[in-house]
């Protein structure tokens, strides 16, 4: 009897609901994130900014865990979410403007500012657009190309909302000027450039997915998620 080999991919959700206690890769990802989060939570440059920046991250983890049984994603999507949260936690530890990775990029590539925030925005668009698309395609039963396009809009919307929340936080902060400088680093177009980088990352990922799908099925606009 020939056994069927289970296929795992970015665009195909698992056909079998795996209990969390048996999902070793996901357990490992969660353990890595918890350890990294705990380490970066120790002595951040600015503790208030740290908890402000990571409040939403903790909410994402809670919501993702709550919907694990009802709407399980592929482990590749979970890996993308975890990697973004780690990159974000690292930036928040150094208030982004002082992140060593960005300082290295600044010296090596000749940037005029610490561009780690741009890197994280690019990663947000690239990594998080995949699970968003997966939810739209498999849970909401949208056509494949619709799911890809709408996921791009969702990424841009979330990035814009984050920029607005930073403005509100700065308005309520006692050290308003310090917060603005640490986030924008003197760039008056900081929010727009962050959104553009998120858009670029999402477009690259979704564009690649559409290209791969087109090579396999020319009628991509008619493709819906299988029941």
Model-derived regions, located:
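Internal alpha-helical transmembrane segments of multi-pass membrane proteins
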Residues: 140-156
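Membrane-interface capping segments at transmembrane-helix boundaries
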Residues: 210-220
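Membrane-interfacial alpha-helical segments at the cytosolic side of multi-pass membrane proteins
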Residues: 59-68, 123-139, 172-177, 195-212
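Interfacial helix-loop-helix junctions of multi-pass membrane proteins
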Residues: 49-50, 101-102, 116, 159-203
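Hydrophobic alpha-helical transmembrane segments
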Residues: 27-31, 51, 77-79, 149-153, ...
């Amino acid at each position: 009897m020939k056994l069927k080999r289970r296929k795992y991919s970015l665009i195909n959700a698992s056909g079998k609901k795996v209990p969390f206690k048996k999902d070793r890769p996901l357990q490992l990802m969660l353990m890595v994130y918890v350890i990294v989060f705990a380490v970066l939570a120790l002595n951040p440059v600015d503790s208030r900014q740290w908890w402000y920046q990571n409040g939403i991250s903790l909410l994402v983890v809670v919501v993702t865990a709550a919907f694990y049984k009802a709407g399980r994603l592929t482990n590749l999507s979970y890996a993308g979410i975890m990697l973004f949260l780690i990159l974000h936690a690292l930036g928040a530890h150094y208030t982004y403007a002082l992140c060593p990775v960005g300082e290295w990029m600044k010296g090596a590539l000749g940037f005029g500012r610490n561009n780690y925030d741009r890197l994280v925005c690019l990663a947000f668009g690239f990594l998080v657009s995949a699970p968003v698309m997966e939810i739209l395609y498999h849970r909401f039963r949208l056509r494949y190309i619709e799911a890809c396009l709408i996921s791009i809009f969702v990424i841009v919307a979330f990035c814009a909302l984050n920029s607005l929340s930073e403005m509100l936080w700065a308005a309520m902060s006692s050290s308003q000027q310090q917060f603005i400088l640490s986030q924008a680093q003197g760039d008056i177009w900081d929010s727009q450039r962050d959104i553009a980088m998120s858009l670029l990352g999402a477009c690259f990922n979704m564009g690649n997915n559409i290209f791969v799908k087109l090579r396999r099925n020319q009628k991509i606009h008619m493709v819906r998620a299988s029941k």
